[in-house]
């Protein structure tokens, strides 16, 4: 990336402790090598744990063992989560087989598909970190900037049916990912064993990021209407593909300022949907990334991490001022945004045939967890498919997987393996379950306040019973759960959203847009399951009785008065008492 002449970052002594740590880290090297070599603990130092995030690694521990290990005077059961950088969620069969091999060797026989179209390994011990990352390197994968205060993994619509258009957009998304990540010589030295090169010989280590990188994480995504599978309005920087009448790519509408994270009882924090500010041709995408990220680098809040995301930078300085600064850095004005429409943010499950005649099958992976379960050997089945598949795999933003680019001759073999391992969702799987999504949460995530991945399938089963009672079992309703308010599953744009507050207690949100175009609003705070189901029973019964033709549940919740529509992120935390016969807002 090109540096700018307008770096407004303050000197590190005036900034937060995290900013000072980055500045003093020797470009993210810290003492990571020393921590890795320490045989007396399964952890790394506190400062190195923060720096490891830039390397795509989170230090965690098994929270279910904490009390027992404390009684035994043992340190926590430390382990690490590793997140792969996978632009647009595309990987080859050879890469899938290597990921499977590493998961079995070091990751507890489990792979986790994420809401940003990549893989996570959990349960990796410290002494296995280098072997895991070196194994990824063997198939040209890495974990650079998968976490940390930088440009995170770049997303791209996973629908392969639009073959030529998808290929054009994906190619630009991949270029943006390669361009936006830090240069990270530290990564090459620590994990791949490369020798350090003197800065005077190779130029500045980080010509764009400098010593303090970005104030917080920065998320970029590319979407191809009419499917908003990446939830483009939740991205810091979103590119909405615009195709001409001939289906060829004309360029992108640019959306800025989305983000989900918030903190309970902190009204100054809130989710925000991105604003569309204009249009750029394909050749201006990389420059637009530089300009937008440069504004956040130079104007983002480096004193208060809770207010450091780009969405707050926009709200503090004003959208018009931020757009003007982006255009100043670009050296040209954005063109007016062009018309587009979205109609869903879900996946087209099952078999599809693309424009080029190639076949693709999208498999439902509940909450993205690939393990071998009794009667459902997901990990095993997909490994066997990867052994014979000549095309690619694509991870969707809904934590599902597409087996893509299947030829006519190959299809019968793939179909046979799908039947053998029972990998396709049956007709009895409800539309609600197919549109459900949860973050990992307990027992590994250190931020989780309540269950998510392990609990949502059970809760969905109870809501399914309500849907059957009211004749709504085939109605597509989006439901998302996060174990804390940070919102990794993007719950604040779901028609039914839940975020953990304490063990067994959740905030319940209603009224999100079916294709991610509207934030929802809280209707129950710190509520137990019984109160959640009671309120949903009331609203679903009302929906079944009084909905309009084609009206989605989230739209109905707003129209019927259960929630007032959120028109701006800063309005999200203003409580609105539910109406239309709903229960009280606290339970």
From Swiss-Prot:
E.C. numbers: 1.8.1.2
Swiss-Prot/TrEMBL keywords: 4Fe-4S, Amino-acid biosynthesis, Cysteine biosynthesis, Heme, Iron, Iron-sulfur, Metal-binding, NADP, Oxidoreductase
Molecular function, one GO term: sulfite reductase (ferredoxin) activity
Coiled-coil intervals, chain numbering: none
Pfam families recorded: NIR_SIR, NIR_SIR_ferr
Gene Ontology cellular-component annotations: sulfite reductase complex (NADPH)
Positions contributing to siroheme binding: 488
Pathway the protein takes part in: Sulfur metabolism; hydrogen sulfide biosynthesis; hydrogen sulfide from sulfite (NADPH route): step 1/1
PROSITE patterns in the cross-refs: NIR_SIR
Catalytic reaction(s) noted: hydrogen sulfide + 3 NADP(+) + 3 H2O = sulfite + 3 NADPH + 4 H(+)
Record note on cofactor: Binds 1 siroheme per subunit.
Cofactor(s) the record lists: siroheme; [4Fe-4S] cluster
GO biological process, one term: cysteine biosynthetic process
Sequence ranges of Polar residues compositional bias: 1-13
Domain of life: Bacteria
UniProt-annotated stretches for the region Disordered: 1-20
SUPFAM superfamilies according to UniProt: Nitrite and sulphite reductase 4Fe-4S domain-like (SSF56014), Nitrite/Sulfite reductase N-terminal domain-like (SSF55124)
HAMAP family on file: CysI
Subunit structure: Alpha(8)-beta(8). The alpha component is a flavoprotein, the beta component is a hemoprotein.
Functional summary from the UniProt entry: Component of the sulfite reductase complex that catalyzes the 6-electron reduction of sulfite to sulfide. This is one of several activities required for the biosynthesis of L-cysteine from sulfate.
Entry's family note: Belongs to the nitrite and sulfite reductase 4Fe-4S domain family.
Protein name: Sulfite reductase [NADPH] hemoprotein beta-component
Organism: Bordetella petrii (strain ATCC BAA-461 / DSM 12804 / CCUG 43448)
Lineage of the organism: Bacteria, Pseudomonadati, Pseudomonadota, Betaproteobacteria, Burkholderiales
